[in-house]
From Swiss-Prot:
PANTHER family: ADENYLATE CYCLASE-ASSOCIATED CAP C-TERMINAL DOMAIN-CONTAINING PROTEIN (PTHR33747:SF1), UPF0225 PROTEIN SCO1677 (PTHR33747). SUPFAM superfamilies: NTF2-like, Sec-C motif. It holds the Pfam family YchJ_M-like. It comes from the Bacteria. This is UPF0225 protein YchJ. Belongs to the UPF0225 family. InterPro entries: NTF2-like_dom_sf, SEC_C_motif, UPF0225, YchJ-like_M.
Length: 152
């Protein structure tokens, strides 16, 4: 039996993000690219992360930083809670929560990632980190307050 994809899709990895991470296919939209990039973090694939960063970002210079992060970070799960894009605009956004442990402490990245499509391929550009009040509902959709969920 194959393993489930780390991206949280509940689909086997070989049928989900593997074709993108392996280079067999190009991610068809920002959500698939973001999910496959999360898998690359889980599987410590710096080459895929660098390849899918927009060339203007100079991602190759981040290789050492990525490799150092791999050694100290364990990824625990991904929740995508919003995505929007239009192929005609060549720009898209994906909002997500990625949970991890680092140095024995649990944390979460909550980001609205921006993607750009050039020559038929989507690239990660950058992301913003929205601010949430401690008593706001958690954006991951758990129904809990932010302070009792991803804000810990």
């Amino acid at each position: 039996m194959s393993q489930l994809c780390p991206c949280g899709s509940a689909v086997e990895y070989s049928l989900c993000c593997h074709p993108y991470v392996s280079g067999e296919k190009v991610a068809p939209d920002p959500e698939h690219l973001m999910r496959s990039r999360y898998c690359a973090f889980v599987m410590q694939d710096a080459d895929y992360l660098i390849k899918t960063w927009h060339p203007s970002c100079g991602a190759a210079a981040l290789r050492a930083e990525l490799m150092a992060g791999f050694a100290h970070t364990e990824w625990l799960g991904l929740t995508v809670f919003e995505h929007c894009w239009q192929d005609a605009d060549n720009i898209g956004f994906v909002s997500f929560v990625a949970r991890f442990t680092e140095g024995g402490k649990t944390g979460a990245i909550i980001e609205r990632s921006r993607f750009l499509k050039e020559n038929g391929q989507w690239y990660y550009i950058d992301g913003t980190r929205p601010q949430f009040g401690r008593n706001d509902p958690c954006p991951c959709g758990s129904g809990k307050k932010f302070k009792k969920c991803c804000g810990q």
